[in-house]
Amino acid sequence: MKTTIALLLVAVWFPANGQNLETPALRPDPPLPYGATVDSSIPVYKPVKGLSGSLKGVESNTVTAVTDAWIAGFTKIYPDVKISVDIGGSGQGGPRLTAGTADFGFIAREMMGREETPFVDKFGYKPLAIAVSGGSLAVKAFTDCIVFIVNKDNPLEEVTFPQLDAIYSATHNRGIKNPIATWGQLGLTGEWADKPIHAWGVEIPNGYDTFVNMHVLANGQWREGIQSQHTVIPLSDKVAADKYAISYTGLAWDTNPNTKVLKLAVHPGDPFLAPTFENVALQKYPLSRVIYIFINREPGKPINAVLREFIRYALSQQGQQAIVQDRIFTPLPAALDARETEKLK
């Protein structure tokens, strides 16, 4: 699967992945094919009485259109509510919450340790992460799903998370005790059996490596010896040029025709899934991504009413429709939407 998408870049690559975050709003150009719909079982937002107040937020520069739509819809219902949002980039969510200068951070990736640790040191608990949108399938710089790729001549077609963990980690939190260092250990035979695996990735910390560490390595430690690049941009070419290479990357950045995307399964025995639009939109593909609103909520304490209702609106039928109308990110599946809404109670 190869997807090449032109992008109107405003002074930066990778706003959602931890690099060069002080940028204007970013939009893909030209408009992209899109086929997502909102699950009809997601509830329509029902207003509460007498809501007034103000909120201040910070957002990634890739989500501004969605935020604007949410604010417009919400303040039409509640004219006595004022919401202002700074485009500070995903990397500003943690620091602004820690400093108390933002009520929420709309962040287009997971929060990195260097962003979360000062918050935990100050408050004694982690920021509450509420998923409010799916990522994109393969839009450059817009929280694209993550894939593992190999050279097109490699006969391997699929791989499990425990196998990837044994290739990339020193801790092996997913249960395979010994490192996987040759292609034969993944079941390849003949000339491939004793050939070394050349593992590639991104220099840490970065939004891509943070996601892979959390979801594939089960928060383990990276092993020594992984070859890396400063961004994911060259990784497709690196794998295309090396018959024995493997790398994770964003699907949008896998542009070299001489690579192949592997199907993934979280556990042995699970079905192996490819990153099709349907699998990503329904969050079935194991490395589909989501976009979060982070807030400072002390465990056991209620959320500010205006903030609670704003997030509830984002998770409502109206809020998810705004995501579809933007035609970049995917709305949440109903079950995930319901789980995230429960966090507001």
Positions of predicted regions on the chain:
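Sec-dependent signal peptide recognition
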Residues: M1-L7
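Flexible loop/hinge segments at secondary-structure junctions
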Residues: Q19-K345
